[in-house]
């Protein structure tokens, strides 16, 4: 298996031009004072569909041939990849079917349907979404695009870090949320090309530390679906495409608690007036845990998404 390279990220950026938002990079005096660092926040919560996932989805679908476009695409997702695929399919004028868990946030399900996709539900505790997706693909001749373990998907995700580093110049450290590894592996390709000395950290919820364990042992660790408010990181294992890139290019994998995610959600709302979903807060929570470790340095965070039900959001912030 040939691993993806930074060249693939560059080509993905060319395909995304005119379709994906070049999301803003914000700063916060409050956060700089708290950490002692100069912190740059890449806001993928302001991406189309409210998440970085649109980047990888559009890049993958844009490479379909005419027969694939006619047959359509099938994907399985807890929400953000679903919306990314649904919108990309609409823009490229192809049918899309999305396999989503029964407990997926209602806002994500509604948005997926509004983009024109057909939604098929599964029970994430008792059913295998990958098998359901493969079966649908075989039955209807559709192409299956996984949410992270695909070279075109991870290359597309890497364009967010490419934009960040082209804006900031070299960074001393960069914090990125970790679920299946699409964003982290794509970010690693861009970071090693544009800021080779940058310390790159993946961040997982404590309950879903399969990535950390995989990184420590050198082989992919499988776990049960983790119980965490970070629904975008409720993955059971890293991917065959993502893990080798992570193993070779990431400095460490950190974990944070759900309580720390809520505190970071509160920070984004109170200090930066931004709605960020729990998974999108992984990077900030990890940086804040490290206190003043990066005093005097330039640090980046990628906020991966802002799709969260209003009721759940209010409930979490109330505590």
Swiss-Prot record:
Gene3D superfamilies: 3.40.50.1100. Induction: By D,L-threo-3-hydroxyaspartate. CDD domains: Thr-dehyd (cd01562). Requires a divalent metal cation such as Mn(2+), Mg(2+), or Ca(2+). The keyword Manganese applies. Optimum temperature is 35 degrees Celsius. PROSITE patterns: DEHYDRATASE_SER_THR. It is an enzyme of class 4 (lyase). One of its GO terms (molecular function) is serine racemase activity. The modification N6-(pyridoxal phosphate)lysine is found at residue 53. Its cofactor is pyridoxal 5'-phosphate; Mn(2+); Mg(2+); Ca(2+). It catalyses: (3S)-3-hydroxy-L-aspartate = oxaloacetate + NH4(+). The keyword Magnesium applies. Optimum pH is 9.0. Changing residue 53 to A: Loss of enzymatic activity. Pyridoxal 5'-phosphate binds at residues 80, 179-183, 304. Is strongly inhibited by hydroxylamine and EDTA in vitro. InterPro entries: Ser/Thr_deHydtase_PyrdxlP-BS, TrpB-like_PALP, TrpB-like_PALP_sf. It comes from the Bacteria. One of its GO terms (biological process) is modified amino acid catabolic process. May be either a monomer or a homodimer. NCBIfam families: PRK07048.1. Belongs to the serine/threonine dehydratase family. This is L-threo-3-hydroxyaspartate ammonia-lyase. It comes from Pseudomonas sp. The gene is thadh.
